[in-house]
Amino acid sequence: MLWAHRKKRKAATETTEDKPLESHRANDSWIKSHFSRLSEERLPTYRYVSNNGHSPESRHGEVNTTLHVDTLTTKHGERGAALHRDSFASKQKISGSSMTKEMQRESGKSPSMEDDTWAAVAACTKEIDAKGHRVANSMLQRSTTHRRKGHAESRNISPEELKALEEVEIKLKGNFLTHHETGVAGANQSHTVYSQSRHSNQSHHSYPSHQSNQSHPVYSSYQGHHPSHLSPQSYPSYSSHQSHPGHSNHQGHSGLSSHQTHLGHSNHQGHPGHSSHQSHQGQPGHPSHQSHNLPNRRNPIYGS
């Protein structure tokens, strides 16, 4: 009996030892096949076929990948712009679960055709930079609002300078920077709209003596006048008030206090809770007393 139990245990241990080895081999083979399939699908898009004509994948299941990277560097010196090319060759070899990688670097000057191309790019860039500086300086010199407001208007640029700048820009775009044309056009359009909006806002702030004839929606107007003292151009349903010779104009703004005089007539604006007193010029002996926003007080009426 003991011998039979020992034999069964020995057989069970052998089978358990064989199963992990078989499962490990199966997993290893699956990983290898999966990795090789990924290499066949993705790696060919980043590699170059060798010049000797052999397939990148050899007969023994090896995968060879060669990647060439060229880096061009422009250096400005006393003799002008010099172009240097750095060539990198990366070789990768995969054999089963092992992978070897080699990287070589070769430096040298680029061919004459590439030198001419980069020289043309540098010339166009320098030309557009110089013209851009001239246009900016002329705009700043002719601008009258720049010294006070801190920005220049688009109308201060002359059409000749703008045309010359656009010609160089189109030349540069058409030859080398075609894919940036949409972005530059959008940037120029947004800058123009910004300049126009800033210019439209200046008309409201540069002339404070003419704001009595304009009404802004951000200020609320309170009317506490008696009907016998309203000016002919004052309507309760409108927020704009106009002052004419011989008539007084009253406006109440919350948080805003101003005192303006037009053509010898007084125009007072009072805060809520304060009384405003005015006398009409040319009509002595007829004082007019009016209060704004006083719920517990009445407006006295004087006979004319």
From Swiss-Prot:
Residues 195-206, 229-248, 264-292 have a biased composition (Low complexity). Keywords: Phosphoprotein. Disulfide bonds: none annotated. The keyword Glycoprotein does not apply. Residues 91-101, 208-223, 249-263 have a biased composition (Polar residues). Residues 1-28, 91-115, 138-160, 190-304 are annotated as: Disordered. It holds the Pfam family DUF5569. Residues 16-27, 151-160 have a biased composition (Basic and acidic residues). The modification Phosphoserine is found at residues 39, 158. Residues 1-10 have a biased composition (Basic residues). This is Uncharacterized protein C10orf62 homolog. The lineage of its organism: Eukaryota, Metazoa, Chordata, Craniata, Vertebrata.
